[in-house]
Regions:
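Binding-site signature for planar aromatic cofactors or substrates
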Residues: 1-207
């Protein structure tokens, strides 16, 4: 990912927070079929390896897992909030007119060798952990035990798990850091006044 110095984010805990806060990640691999990409929920184990390890699963009918069996490098992308930045937000525009539209956003990219697994116990543990993560906070959280055991076994038999020990982690926080203080304040205030939740979140992050 292209990351100008002003927008680089390399604090591991900050990167991990964005990974864990992204409900749906993007898995990209390159193989005999060319580039393949899928949107899937991912689970981070932050203590496994220097940058953590990511876990997920794919349907057996999805050909991407076959490309991953050889240990091919995987790219996992975690997009954060984003916002269109209008030149009209910049006070400096009134002075010299030298302003164009841009975009503010957060993104994390994780790279590492993929490992595919079929073990039923390991798959069950992964699905349980993902379920507990996304059911947390509900009044009556769903658990694997809420469904018939044979049905869960059937569902587990239709998926393949994978792990990606992270070997490289990149983070980008593009929040108008390359502008002067009045322009930064103008963008922040302009986004805060928007009715779009993503705009408001970017404004909050700029404080």
């Amino acid at each position: 990912m292209y990351i100008p110095r002003a927008f680089n984010e390399d604090d591991l805990s900050t990167l991990h927070r964005q990974i864990e806060g992204t409900r749906l990640g993007i898995l990209v691999t390159q193989g005999a079929r060319g580039l393949l990409a899928n949107h899937i929920p991912l689970l981070l184990s932050p203590e496994q390896g220097p940058y953590g390890t990511l876990y997920g699963h794919l349907a057996k009918a999805n050909p991407q897992w076959q490309e991953m069996e050889s240990g091919t490098e995987a790219l996992l992308m975690f997009p954060g909030p984003d916002a269109y930045v209008s030149p009209s937000f910049y006070p400096s525009k009134a002075e010299h007119g030298q302003a164009v539209p841009t975009w503010n956003y957060l993104a994390v990219h994780a790279y590492g060798p993929a490992e595919v697994f079929h073990d039923a116990h390991r798959l069950r543990d992964l699905v349980r952990a993902l379920t507990e993560k996304h059911e947390a906070g509900r009044a009556t959280p769903w658990t694997l035990e809420d469904a018939p055991a044979d049905y869960i076994d059937k569902m587990l038999g239709a998926i393949v798990g994978f792990a990606v020990p992270i070997s490289r982690l990149e983070g980008k926080r593009k929040l108008t850091q390359n502008r002067n203080a009045p322009d930064i304040a103008g963008v922040r205030d302009g986004l805060a006044a928007s009715s779009a939740p993503n705009d408001n979140e970017i404004a909050r992050l700029m404080r």
